[in-house]
């Protein structure tokens, strides 16, 4: 009986831990509303590499650009036809600094945004949760959104995401918010 009870407690603990570490998504519109209504109480970060922002666009609604992954231009994969991307070793420390600058702590709501939401948005949110931050979400479909499956825009990132939701963005980058190592 003790073994069964112990097994159940361990299983429940592992399930609870797994659930606690899965970041939840929010829409661009929900994020915009939160930044307007409670902007002093949340930290909204763009986790894209700054060069990517330079070519795709930026929203000044974010508090800061803190890349989760940084492009390593010295390592190129011929097979994938892409440069390597490594986790920014200063990511957590930079998020802590951004929270401190707003007078917030690790219990404050943090929202991350990447290009599509899945490759760095959700992983960066989960990375923060695994490191002691308690309330982290990511923007579903990110800044640029998903590719259209059909029609004249087929293959272009013209569906959902911050850019396609009618929210403010620009090709201009706020120099006070862009990441500089």
Please provide the spans of the model-predicted regions:
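Short, surface-exposed ligand- or partner-binding patches at beta-edge/loop junctions that are enriched
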Residues: 113
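Glycine-rich nucleotide phosphate-binding loop and flanking beta-alpha elements
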Residues: 51
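Short hydrophobic beta-strand that contains or immediately precedes a catalytic carboxylate
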Residues: 43-48, 66
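Bacterial N-terminal signal peptides
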Residues: 7-15
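Positively charged n-region of N-terminal signal peptides that target proteins for export
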Residues: 1-5
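Rhodanese-like catalytic fold shared by cysteine-dependent sulfurtransferases
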Residues: 18-40, 54-109, 119-181
């Amino acid at each position: 009986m003790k073994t069964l009870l112990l097994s159940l407690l361990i299983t429940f603990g592992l399930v609870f831990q797994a659930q606690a570490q899965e970041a939840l998504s929010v829409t661009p519109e929900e994020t915009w509303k939160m930044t307007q209504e409670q902007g002093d109480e949340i930290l909204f970060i763009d986790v894209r590499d700054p060069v990517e922002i330079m070519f795709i666009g930026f929203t000044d609604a974010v508090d800061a650009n803190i890349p989760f992954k940084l492009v390593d231009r010295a390592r190129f994969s011929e097979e994938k036809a892409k440069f390597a991307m490594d986790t920014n070793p200063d990511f957590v420390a930079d998020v802590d600094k951004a929270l401190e600058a707003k007078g917030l702590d690790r219990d404050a709501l943090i929202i991350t945004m990447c290009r599509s939401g899945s490759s760095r948005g959700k992983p960066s949110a989960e990375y923060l949760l695994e490191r002691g931050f308690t309330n982290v979400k990511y923007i579903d479909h990110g800044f640029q959104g998903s590719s259209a499956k059909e029609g004249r825009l087929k293959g272009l990132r013209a569906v959902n995401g911050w850019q396609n939701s009618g929210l403010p963005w620009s090709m201009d980058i706020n120099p006070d918010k862009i990441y500089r190592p």
